């Protein structure tokens, strides 16, 4: 037994020595390990270190990061990640920079750097022609096709990232050409944007649009993906120097490649040839969308999405007459052959068309859940304006209106020849026009200058502004946007020229339960007693204004009275002085006597307060008598006896007295509800109580904002009613 214990003791001592040796070795390894080889120092790299590692310049590094979609990161501890005493400001993931080492564009950047050195050397030797030849023939061309495939493995991924691309390209399409924004880039952006718009027109994919301060928002649905972009208004844009157009130009270079891929895929998916035919001469005349001609890949005839009349006025009239003759011949042939259509076939076709319509589910009970309703379908969008012929006046924005009308089925749109080529008709008096979009105020005909007349018949060459053609509907541009957002045709009389337009609301912001709804009336969304409180507050403000007005008039009258008294007393003194001693001053002895008498009287005077009280009471009685006399005069002028006017005043006072207990009752009820809520909160846990407090705070804030908006609307409506 003793020997066994000795062996166990030796074994423990041996193991203890091994454990101590392991601890010593681990400490040595920990001390010898370098800092910055693990943790945040290993995961992050600064921008300077990344540029040195890739061996490119800083502008090329920025371009490469934009192309590859790599952006700076924010570490938790900048001091640990920077590996230096002073923390850096810009960090990247080390893995991202390691990923960039294998990018083929690095070779192109290095070739560009070598070429720039050769060009600088040639210019230094004075060989300008050699430098131009090097720049023209040896400039490396960047291809971003492989980057598009890497960043967007599927076409749906590309559609999801199309919002920013469209917004930036539409922005550059409306910029003026400068040294920082060349005309070649602007032309490319315009062409790609028009091609994308043509796809939306051909497929009726546009769903919503909204006019805002920033520009015009559009929303389209392509393959189930909602795409929203912003188009600026066509004002004269001023290019400022505080914007770095080199970085924006890099984004434009990437987004043009992306949109080119997307347009090709979209066109081929519906059987159209990409790129579509482009008429440069027509585009120079301002045709824009009409300069493109879509062609089918599997059909012999061209797909005409836009109807234009490119003939001169005389040829257009000849074409109209020939078309009428052809139609008459076709009608005669049909009458001779007696082709009858079966009504059953027509009914079945109508049923098949109705099958594709989207059903709307409306809740039966008010307490039932409301399902999100489906949006307008492509067929309904394509037939919204299909039966109309529009004419856009010169003052209306032609480009957005043309795009919207064509996207929702309109094939015949005319405008003035000043706005450009590509219109269905340039004649404002064309009998085929059903709707005219006008955005100018109503002016009297006498204030307009005379128009030039035709030398042949003496008639005016063009209709005068403000003239109305019988049988034509005149609307303002907002009617088009509101009809599209509502998915149906609205009343045109609400949008007549000169009429006060209804509010233009965002189609993507739905009114909440506790929020303010500008479409609903005030009576439907006011809280209990809110109108009475507003009336009381308004009466109180009016009373204060009347009191302040009366006080100001009284002060003015008193000042005028004092001025008149002073003037009269001054006139009397001057006349008295002139009558005594030929205008000489009176001896000062009397003044001294009077002053001494006044001084004695001041020493002996008592009871000033009683006299002052008596004078104030007499003034009050005089004021009451004067006010009563004034009221009698007002009642007599109104044709009422004084008793009736006094009864009306007593009625208003009685109404105010009756409203006071109502306000007290509401305050008591509100206090009771708050006490009940506090009593219920006592039974909750701390977590639920905090959540309830947050909900109550947000609801109160929302209610206050809604009440403020309702109060503003109430004042506007009262002002309109007074007018």
Curated annotation (Swiss-Prot):
<dbReference type="GO" id="GO:0005654">
    <property type="term" value="C:nucleoplasm"/>
</dbReference>
<keyword id="KW-0698">rRNA processing</keyword>
<feature type="region of interest" description="Disordered">
    <location>
        <begin position="440"/>
        <end position="471"/>
    </location>
</feature>
<dbReference type="GO" id="GO:0030687">
    <property type="term" value="C:preribosome, large subunit precursor"/>
</dbReference>
<dbReference type="GO" id="GO:0003723">
    <property type="term" value="F:RNA binding"/>
</dbReference>
<feature type="compositionally biased region" description="Basic and acidic residues">
    <location>
        <begin position="623"/>
        <end position="634"/>
    </location>
</feature>
<feature type="compositionally biased region" description="Acidic residues">
    <location>
        <begin position="608"/>
        <end position="622"/>
    </location>
</feature>
<feature type="compositionally biased region" description="Basic and acidic residues">
    <location>
        <begin position="670"/>
        <end position="681"/>
    </location>
</feature>
<dbReference type="InterPro" id="IPR010613">
    <property type="entry name" value="PES"/>
</dbReference>
<keyword id="KW-0690">Ribosome biogenesis</keyword>
<keyword id="KW-0175">Coiled coil</keyword>
<comment type="similarity">
    <text>Belongs to the pescadillo family.</text>
</comment>
<dbReference type="Pfam" id="PF06732">
    <property type="entry name" value="Pescadillo_N"/>
</dbReference>
<feature type="compositionally biased region" description="Acidic residues">
    <location>
        <begin position="588"/>
        <end position="600"/>
    </location>
</feature>
<feature type="domain" description="BRCT">
    <location>
        <begin position="380"/>
        <end position="497"/>
    </location>
</feature>
<feature type="region of interest" description="Disordered">
    <location>
        <begin position="501"/>
        <end position="723"/>
    </location>
</feature>
<comment type="subunit">
    <text>Component of the NOP7 complex, composed of ERB1, NOP7 and YTM1. The complex is held together by ERB1, which interacts with NOP7 via its N-terminal domain and with YTM1 via a high-affinity interaction between the seven-bladed beta-propeller domains of the 2 proteins. The NOP7 complex associates with the 66S pre-ribosome.</text>
</comment>
<feature type="compositionally biased region" description="Basic residues">
    <location>
        <begin position="710"/>
        <end position="723"/>
    </location>
</feature>
<dbReference type="GO" id="GO:0000466">
    <property type="term" value="P:maturation of 5.8S rRNA from tricistronic rRNA transcript (SSU-rRNA, 5.8S rRNA, LSU-rRNA)"/>
</dbReference>
<dbReference type="GO" id="GO:0000463">
    <property type="term" value="P:maturation of LSU-rRNA from tricistronic rRNA transcript (SSU-rRNA, 5.8S rRNA, LSU-rRNA)"/>
</dbReference>
<dbReference type="InterPro" id="IPR036420">
    <property type="entry name" value="BRCT_dom_sf"/>
</dbReference>
<feature type="coiled-coil region">
    <location>
        <begin position="522"/>
        <end position="551"/>
    </location>
</feature>
<comment type="function">
    <text>Component of the NOP7 complex, which is required for maturation of the 25S and 5.8S ribosomal RNAs and formation of the 60S ribosome.</text>
</comment>
<dbReference type="GO" id="GO:0043021">
    <property type="term" value="F:ribonucleoprotein complex binding"/>
</dbReference>
<feature type="compositionally biased region" description="Acidic residues">
    <location>
        <begin position="537"/>
        <end position="550"/>
    </location>
</feature>
<feature type="coiled-coil region">
    <location>
        <begin position="656"/>
        <end position="723"/>
    </location>
</feature>
<dbReference type="InterPro" id="IPR001357">
    <property type="entry name" value="BRCT_dom"/>
</dbReference>
<dbReference type="GO" id="GO:0070545">
    <property type="term" value="C:PeBoW complex"/>
</dbReference>
<protein>
    <recommendedName>
        <fullName>Pescadillo homolog</fullName>
    </recommendedName>
</protein>
<keyword id="KW-0539">Nucleus</keyword>
<feature type="compositionally biased region" description="Basic and acidic residues">
    <location>
        <begin position="700"/>
        <end position="709"/>
    </location>
</feature>
